[in-house]
């Protein structure tokens, strides 16, 4: 388990937040049932490295004022122009209790239906997973190699983990292969809708 060191914040002015960020640190907050809300700041490079190495759903040891907490990142705010993390939320977790988190789906393989001219549709990109913190997967892999035209991949088809469960209906669609003509018809309908103009009131 990776360990990060954070400092407790007592100054909440805008100038203080600006100074934290310009010094290469990220303001954040650590919260939990028995912890309350505790504003903190931590090294930006170390945070990015930890998330890259461990994954966003990893359990991290966050040390604040000599006290260690098992936490997970629940929210990251970023500046898209500077590509920087501007704020981070850390939730204290009980390692023996189940929690629910969003886990991304990663489709693997090339579907037979796509090779035959079909079009891959993926309506679901993340799953709500329930598990103890250490058992949460970083991604859920779904093999679509055998998926043919007019076939669907549902929650029931995903590999079940003995240590976690999905908080979804079993028939919820993860991916499907549309016939080429169905995709073309949908595109034509969209074009016709865009080109349609309402009739003028004074038109003879």
From Swiss-Prot:
For bias kind Acidic residues, which ranges apply?
186-204
Q: Which GO terms describe its cellular component?
A: cytosolic large ribosomal subunit
Sorted alphabetically, the Gene Ontology BP terms of this entry are: translation
Q: What Gene Ontology molecular function terms does this protein carry?
A: 5S rRNA binding; structural constituent of ribosome
InterPro entries, per database record: Rbsml_bL25/Gln-tRNA_synth_N, Ribosomal_bL25/Gln-tRNA_synth, Ribosomal_bL25_b-dom, Ribosomal_bL25_C, Ribosomal_bL25_long, Ribosomal_L25_dom, Ribosomal_uL5_bac-type
Disulfide pairs here are none
Pfam families xrefs = Ribosomal_L25p, Ribosomal_TL5_C
Keywords, ordered alphabetically: Ribonucleoprotein, Ribosomal protein, RNA-binding, rRNA-binding, Stress response
Gene3D superfamilies, A to Z:
Ribosomal protein L25, beta domain, Ribosomal Protein L25, Chain P
Tell me the segments the record calls region Disordered: 177-204
Signal peptide residues on this chain, from the entry's feature table = none
The knockout outcome noted for this protein's gene is:
Cells sporulate poorly at 48 degrees Celsius.
UniProt KW Ribonucleoprotein keyword = yes
The induction field says: By heat shock, salt stress, oxidative stress, glucose limitation and oxygen limitation.
The record, for PANTHER family, names: RIBOSOMAL PROTEIN L25/GLN-TRNA SYNTHETASE, ANTI-CODON-BINDING DOMAIN-CONTAINING PROTEIN, RIBOSOMAL PROTEIN L25_GLN-TRNA SYNTHETASE, ANTI-CODON-BINDING DOMAIN-CONTAINING PROTEIN
Assembly and partners are described as: Part of the ribosome (presumably the 50S subunit) under heat-stress but not control growth conditions. Binds 5S rRNA.
Q: What does this protein do?
A: Not required for exponential growth; probably functions in vegetatively growing cells, maybe required for accurate translation under stress conditions.
HAMAP family from the xrefs?
Ribosomal_bL25_CTC
Which family, according to UniProt? Answer: Belongs to the bacterial ribosomal protein bL25 family. CTC subfamily.
Provide the protein name: General stress protein Ctc
Quote the gene name from the UniProt entry: ctc
